[in-house]
Amino acid sequence: MRRTHYAGSLRETHVGEEVVLEGWVNRRRDLGGLIFLDLRDREGLVQLVAHPASPAYATAERVRPEWVVRAKGLVRLRPEPNPRLATGRVEVELSALEVLAEAKTPPFPVDAGWRGEEEKEASEELRLKYRYLDLRRRRMQENLRLRHRVIKAIWDFLDREGFVQVETPFLTKSTPEGARDFLVPYRHEPGLFYALPQSPQLFKQMLMVAGLDRYFQIARCFRDEDLRADRQPDFTQLDLEMSFVEVEDVLELNERLMAHVFREALGVELPLPFPRLSYEEAMERYGSDKPDLRFGLELKEVGPLFRQSGFRVFQEAESVKALALPKALSRKEVAELEEVAKRHKAQGLAWARVEEGGFSGGVAKFLEPVREALLQATEARPGDTLLFVAGPRKVAATALGAVRLRAADLLGLKREGFRFLWVVDFPLLEWDEEEEAWTYMHHPFTSPHPEDLPLLEKDPGRVRALAYDLVLNGVEVGGGSIRIHDPRLQARVFRLLGIGEEEQREKFGFFLEALEYGAPPHGGIAWGLDRLLALMTGSPSIREVIAFPKNKEGKDPLTGAPSPVPEEQLRELGLMVVRP
């Protein structure tokens, strides 16, 4: 007896056929004369019926949920259809039933989603410990199958566009890329280490030097950094690189690719082209370089209105950002939003309610001298609440931008659909206050804007990068740039970052030498596939779209990793554990 059909694939067209099915018992019901079994496989479930006269009846009496069985029977119309199931108009009258494996009772239910009912969530730690059971749930299987469709759509599209898939090494050299490396000791020479790649950045650029022209890879990457909802120590990205291109070429191709992915994987049509904002404009209007465009609530710069106001907090601030909310907020709500602002380095959150003919509450008395101009600038109306953050330009924007997001929750604003945008014209460098040095916004291989090259040493903070981020619903899902292909320019950028010639040779010598053999202009991008899939599925965490993820501490409750290793193995590697 071999399987002839998936249980979830049976329809009215199969009525009258004898079928053999294999899968798990989702639920068992004994009605005193008939026994009903719901048989589940990856395609769904179908109802099986065992009559007392059937040879299958004795086995049906003893099976329990999650047992693995093989069933044989005749497909017939179901007397009472179940509209919640795709197979709800048919059932299988059993002639044979064989137990392939018995099962313990799972520590949490896995059956509800397959019946079209709401799934009850167990604790995440329990789900991760028994991940193989968690993956039996319908939603989790749908997430993994969507992941498959997305990757297949990427492959199909890029293959048609002339891209070549190339695997790059997992064991490579430790180079500074912004996060800590995972190190792998080299057994043959204690004291030497490989590093797991944080990205295939240098290898894909060298593939362009090699003349491959168009490369892509579904790449595994590793970063030893603090974890949060959208981070894992090991993660997956779509990595691609193109030769002889400018910014427009990369953006246009990626828009078409993303539209293809959403069409094939979700049946959703994305409007093209995606809107674009400069980094400066995104920060000014939304207080974020990854703004959520699914709702309005734009920030307004109102500092100039208060230059002669006498309200010193606003008068002396570099920037005063204002946000009009279409609600008269309570003091409790204002206090909650003020805490958000303070967490983002603001000194406080000023506020006032807009009334007919004036303001009330908070800093109302300081606003009266500029009332007309302020209402015009913020487009506030009676019944609204005005919120203000004053301070350094970046702090004011970032803090009120964070308030904007929390306010959208308080107001119950709808955040539906998929709103993409490109953020472009990033600064090449930013000043690190703690280190008192310039550091890169993206990575040190990003090309400066050609128009800004004269400023590189004179005024580095004003140099724009040929860099771009792809943002979806307020989340960065991709980032890339045109790369530096001139070894002399690359050396200049390294020097600006405080990387001297000796350190350049030690850490990047192989790459700088490659550039000296004729590198084409090139650029590319990397998508965070896990983040993208979490957004496509409406999941709260990327752990929901990864088969076997780590928990928030970077540990695996299923396998117990990371775990101690024998002393003998450490000695072989020339290692000794020193506990802090």
Curated annotation (Swiss-Prot):
GO terms for biological process: aspartyl-tRNA aminoacylation. GO terms for cellular component: cytoplasm. Induction: Constitutively expressed in a constant ratio along the growth of the bacterium. The keyword Protein biosynthesis applies. ATP binds at R223, D224, E225, Q232, E476, G528, L529, D530, R531. Homodimer. This is Aspartate--tRNA(Asp) ligase.
